[in-house]
Amino acid sequence: MAVRKILKIGNPILRQTSEDVSESEIQTKDFKKLIRDMFETMRHADGVGLAAPQIGVLKKLVVVGQEDDNERYPGTPEVPNQIILNPEITPLSPPRDGFWEGCLSVPGMRGYVERPNKIRMKWRDENYVEHDEIIEGYRAIVLQHECDHLFGVLYVDRLKSTKLFGYNEDIDTAGKLLD
């Protein structure tokens, strides 16, 4: 396993659309190593999720997982470890629940983004088994954020207002910009 370099905003790879993962790909040693590396990279950076494009791989692959309080997102609930291939998301509520999002590709900053609190997600797992699930709350927000990366979208593209964007140290624990 290896910690991979996380690409930062400005790198053109982050703005490209990823390709689907094929069933034959998931059987390869390289793909299995990629998944292990992604989990290790995510944990090393204290992230909740990581999309393959963030490490320069243009494949529709996301890993998520947060077992206990994450230092970057105190007070947030657990997110189960999950490998997600070729996701499709359908919003089931209007984009009204706001959250101060951060991103490993936009280090040291946060922005207020409103997203649907309830989604339907179809995806395949690491065994290429298809899943279809209704997801709500924090996990739904995390999954939408990570899946955006697969289509070249960063959370800064979804800011409610550029006035609600700043450095971590300028945002208090309640998510308000400090004066």
Curated annotation (Swiss-Prot):
Cofactor(s) needed: Fe(2+)
Cofactor binding description: Binds 1 Fe(2+) ion.
Active site positions, chain numbering: E146
CDD domains: Pep_deformylase
UniProt keywords, alphabetically: Hydrolase, Iron, Metal-binding, Protein biosynthesis
UniProt-listed Pfam families: Pep_deformylase
Reaction it catalyzes: N-terminal N-formyl-L-methionyl-[peptide] + H2O = N-terminal L-methionyl-[peptide] + formate
Superkingdom in the source lineage: Bacteria
Record-level Gene Ontology MF annotations: metal ion binding; peptide deformylase activity
Entry's EC annotation: 3.5.1.88
Residues that bind Fe cation: C103, H145, H149
One GO BP: translation
Entry similarity comment: Belongs to the polypeptide deformylase family.
PANTHER family reported for this sequence: PEPTIDE DEFORMYLASE (PTHR10458), PEPTIDE DEFORMYLASE 1 (PTHR10458:SF20)
Function description: Removes the formyl group from the N-terminal Met of newly synthesized proteins. Requires at least a dipeptide for an efficient rate of reaction. N-terminal L-methionine is a prerequisite for activity but the enzyme has broad specificity at other positions.
Protein name, as recorded: Peptide deformylase
